Amino acid sequence: RRTKRFASLSRFVETLVVADDKMAAFHGAGLKHYLLTVMAAAAKAFKHPSIRNPVNLVVTRLVILGSGQEVPQVGPSAAQTLRSFCTWQKGLNPPNDSDPDHFDTAILFTRQDLCGVSTCDALGMAGVGTVCDPARSCAIVEDDGLQSAFTAAHELGHVFNMLHDNSKPCANLNGQGSSSRHVMAPVMAHVDPEEPWSPCSARFITDFLDNGYGHCLLDKPEAPLHLPVTFPGKDYDADRQCQLTFGPDSSHCPQLPPPCAALWCFGHLNGHAMCQTKHSPWADGTPCGPAQACMGGRCLHVDQLKDFNIPQAGGWGPWGPWGDCSRTCGGGVQFSSRDCTKPVPRNGGKYCEGRRTPFRSCNTKNCPHGSALTFREEQCAAYNHRTDLFKSFPGPMDWVPRYTGVAPRDQCKLTCQARALGYYYVLEPRVADGTPCSPDSSSVCVQGRCIHAGCDRIIGSKKKFDKCMVCGGNGSSCSKQSGSFKKFRYGYSDVVTIPAGRTHILVRQQGGSGLKSIYLALKLADGSYALNGEYTLMPSSTDVVLPGAVSLRYSGRTAASETLSGHGPLAQPLTLQVLVAGNPQNVRLRYSFFVPRPVPSTPRPPPQNWLQRRAEILEILRKRTWAGRK
């Protein structure tokens, strides 16, 4: 299903909520209401405008595991538990997205103490960027009270491709000192109610959805479970919140001020009675004084709580100015944007929908002929002197673009190959905006997506190259030249040298029987080989990149009919050769390309004053004739 690019669209995360037998034993008859209360708080976090997307977390199924059922294996290892749960939930999920029982993601709540590699401080685990992958869109959460809502939101944030706020990619986006107060903090204590999601989290989920990875979230569920709308503190007082966090013998420590900011609970630790905290605030709605209740970690008068009950939908602000062009020549991209700030949505109100980031082409003129490298080559070459990338590589590398074997969905990643070693790596998750998607394509990369553009480098243009590689031409400026070759001898033989400027090259080997014995080869003007030289053959299909960023598609030596094809135009002469390694029978090589027609010389136009000059000459001739008659 095609969706609008760079648009804010309502997403519905249909969620399967599962609780294991330890949850059932701890919570008893109140388990279902507790789980829905936790999910309501998690859904509220996803409705906050700081995430900058309309994300609706809905519960479509709730399963409580019991004895006698085939259940996932839940144990101390968080990684093993996650793997087991992901496998189990996939078998429970109907594959058809329109099925009412289908879900987009699954989350397991357990009272099992989960452990990571070195410590048992883990509160959950999930894969990153897996939301529409039925086998991996899953998460596990260790229940430790109502604050588990933020653990659930945190793990689902990973499912939406969010990283921890202290990660390197988030450093520039978040700024200094802001990595500990958001949902995606590596260790959560108090989440800022005014901005639960960091700028990095908002950027990552936006890019993730803009790149089409949330396609399964566009359908609205028919009959989701109703989540509680009352503040959780009304159903679970401070004592009960302590019991949910520290165990049934715990109670609230009322003597520790200030109220609401952090929940302190009485209990026993290592045999000593003491007050302890996990630094989470009291749940919203918890009574904190006469006619007072907590909200966002503050103790407010109950009349003020009404302001938090009324949803306010957001509205788009004005369009901003067009930004800088991503390129100075050769076809760049520039953006404008608008924000959902007129007004900002509040209290779970609807986030703005519609296009938020339009873009257009800019600086489409050709780059100077002195530019030795293509735009993608420049981006790869920027890593040539980086010695910190791979410890096993001795010194600087000569990085060049890699096209062969790169899937179409990965065309806009900066995949580069170390020329000397042949290894290739994704050096950047996306190329610069305006980079051609491939050597023979007019389409360009925009924010990591391949966007259609015409041969005039205008995004959305329908102009195409003709056979002569004239943009918008009618094919009249060139003519087809064809030939064949069948005088084969052992070793390499020249077939034809194709001059520079030729377009739409096609070479095809035809006929033959028995074992394959001849192969195509390409030799450059400097004598080096671009394909199948030095008796080394390319077995599979590949893009042969020639000087000037011209690409020819080679079928591979194992193809039944060996072919070479490409649009051109060639920047340098190219010699087509055949390598004969056996006794070819009934084999013929055919080739064709298009040659520019000679431009007819334009007759010299008469001078602008030719009528006056003609009159003057006629007058001179008339006078001479008259004088001759005298």
Swiss-Prot record:
Tissues showing expression: Brain specific.
Cellular component per GO, a single term: extracellular space
Domain Peptidase M12B residue range list: 11-221
Active site positions, chain numbering: 155
Catalytic activity line of the entry: Glutamyl endopeptidase. Bonds cleaved include 370-Thr-Glu-Gly-Glu-|-Ala-Arg-Gly-Ser-377 in the interglobular domain of mammalian aggrecan
The protein, known as: A disintegrin and metalloproteinase with thrombospondin motifs 4
Stretches for region Spacer: 479-630
Function (record text): Cleaves aggrecan, a cartilage proteoglycan, at the '392-Glu-|-Ala-393' site and may be involved in its turnover. Also cleaves COMP. May play an important role in the destruction of aggrecan in arthritic diseases.
PTM comment: The precursor is cleaved by a furin endopeptidase.
Pfam families: ADAMTS_CR_2 (PF17771), ADAMTS_CR_3 (PF19236), ADAMTS_spacer1 (PF05986), Reprolysin (PF01421), TSP_1 (PF00090)
Domain TSP type-1: 313-368
Cofactor: Zn(2+)
Organism, as annotated: Rattus norvegicus
Cofactor note: Binds 1 zinc ion per subunit.
EC number: 3.4.24.82
Residue stretch(es) of the prosequence: 1-5
